[in-house]
Design a protein with these regions (language model features):
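Terminal, contiguous helix-loop blocks that mediate binding/assembly
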Residues: 1-459, 465-498
């Protein structure tokens, strides 16, 4: 059964990421080496049914000479026309439907509140109509995939509004691929924009895959790919790295494989509680020119700092779950062996050590024999949130540029945003310290059925009941008599407690 994905590229950065992604995705699907065994698909066809997850007009009698009728399931949204015009003048323009392009001329002024409060409400109906028309073309819509930046006004503000609108109107998975601005971003108000957008993305996305400009620049420096004369600029190379992350993430949905993984499975297997929905991602190789000596070398590199999409060390944080998505003609035993080696180097939640997802796509990436994308739901992500909060506080304490936002927001609104970010940091820090989530994520009725009760920190323990083992959180007390130890905390991992 076809499971379609609709891509929404919002703002300048989001559309540039979309341009890079679709440029390579189209090459992969049309590449003769990938499609050299076309007779397996059909006598006159060159694409299989899985391609219809990402493209419209994929017919069984589709011919190479008619490839321009193929249309990407992509919607381009921006409050300026520059990037969209560049895309429509590029070599891949025939693959985009002009009816799926929404642009304006005013821009959002690098102001989250203007993009969210003003343009969001103004263009809601127009954008919603475009989305609905694309949804109606799908047989079985699987998810929405949104690319945007948190530093500007359109990607952060209008992107947040669109994400909230999707959450209200559709039950499908919302997957956000957002770019955190660097510490020396040229947009002076980016600390405000990223701060406000982060709360909305966390609240209305099912899964968030953040990347940071600082980490991408570090990758370019480490791979010695800084801008050269007559070569791509650094931004294009950074976008290409992120595009490769998306390509690896979606490879199992686009091509055949022995262990296919779709986006729904990522959300189901890697997110133990809806609140903890951020993923650390790392890619090996990061660039096409990188030399990978052996398959084992992929796994040795993937946890290195210079392969991380955020400035974070997964080894320092508590890992709640993880996924390894591999491309290439690889034996599953080689993957399993290397996964075990990586897990030995990570601090994994002790009662959830088996929370590992493996995906194998048989089709190699362009210009490389194989590649690996590693996703880790790690508490180390909280350091990125701390940086966003600190940059916000530096401006907020001085009320610098705040009047631009007070036109649409009140001080109470801003303080509420701050409380949400602080709570986000607290919850990740809590589970990092205690290895258990805070009690507010548990369903009391289910806990009682399992023979436990949730107690407050100041509750006194009844002498008639046993104390829980040290592996149990403080807020659970047993309702079982001393003679009955039939239920333990570890039983919870196979039962619905949220």
């Amino acid at each position: 059964m076809v499971r379609e994905i609709i891509f929404l590229h919002v703002g300048q950065c989001g559309n540039q990421l979309g341009h890079e992604f679709w440029s390579v995705a189209i090459k992969e699907h049309l590449n003769k080496k990938i499609n050299e065994k076309r007779e397996l698909v059909g006598k006159h066809s060159f694409m299989n049914d899985s391609a219809s997850s990402f493209f419209e007009n994929v017919y069984k009698n589709f011919n190479l000479n008619q490839k321009e009728s193929l249309k990407a399931r992509a919607i381009l949204i921006d409050t300026e026309t520059g990037v969209a015009n560049e895309i429509m003048k590029s070599s891949i323009s025939p693959y985009f439907d002009e009816n799926n392009i929404f642009t304006q001329h005013s821009g959002a002024g690098n102001n989250w509140s203007q993009g969210y409060m003003y343009y969001g409400k103004m263009y809601e109906t127009l954008i919603d109509n475009i989305i609905r028309k694309n949804v109606e073309k799908c047989d079985s819509l699987q998810s929405f995939y949104i690319t945007s930046s948190l530093g500007g006004g359109t990607g952060s503000g209008l992107g947040s509004y669109i994400l909230e609108m999707l959450s209200d109107n559709y039950k499908q998975i919302k997957f956000s691929n957002c770019v955190f601005p660097s510490a020396c971003d040229d947009v002076i108000t980016s600390p405000y924009n990223s701060f406000f957008a982060l709360t909305k993305i966390h609240e209305f996305s099912n899964c968030v895959l953040p990347v940071s400009n600082d980490a991408l620049l570090d990758i370019l420096n480490s791979k010695k790919l800084k801008e050269k004369k007559n070569d791509k600029n650094d931004y294009s190379k950074m976008n290409n790295i992120v595009a490769n992350v998306i390509l690896n993430l979606t490879s199992s949905m686009r091509f055949e494989g022995s262990l296919n993984v779709d986006i729904n499975e990522i959300c189901t297997n890697l997110i133990p509680y809806p609140f903890f929905n951020f993923m650390l991602s790392s890619l090996s190789p990061c660039v096409e020119t990188e030399n990978i000596r052996t398959f084992d070398h992929l796994f040795k590199n993937v946890l290195n700092r210079n392969n991380q999409m955020l400035i974070a060390n997964p080894k320092d944080g508590l890992s709640l779950s993880m996924a390894f998505l591999v491309r290439g003609n690889i034996n599953i035993s080689d993957v399993t062996k290397n996964v075990l080696l990586i897990k030995n180097n990570l601090n994994i939640l002790r009662y959830n050590k088996d929370a590992t997802k493996i995906g194998l796509c048989n089709v190699s990436p362009l210009n490389q024999p194989y590649s690996l994308l590693c996703l880790i739901n790690s508490c180390e992500i909280r350091n990125s949130f701390l940086q966003i909060l600190e940059r916000f506080n530096k401006l907020f304490k001085r009320k610098a540029h705040l009047h631009h936002y007070l036109e649409y927001l009140t001080m109470d609104d801003i303080l509420e945003f701050k409380e949400k970010i602080q709570n986000l940091i607290f919850e990740y820090s809590y589970i990092q310290k205690n290895s258990f989530c805070s009690p507010k994520f548990l369903n009391r009725n289910t806990i009682n059925i399992l023979g436990y009760d949730i107690c407050e920190e100041n509750d006194t323990h009844d002498n008639n009941y046993i104390n829980l083992e040290s592996s149990n959180p403080y807020y659970l007390k047993s309702k079982i008599k001393k003679c009955d130890k039939s239920i333990s905390w570890f039983d919870f991992k196979t039962k619905p407690i949220i």
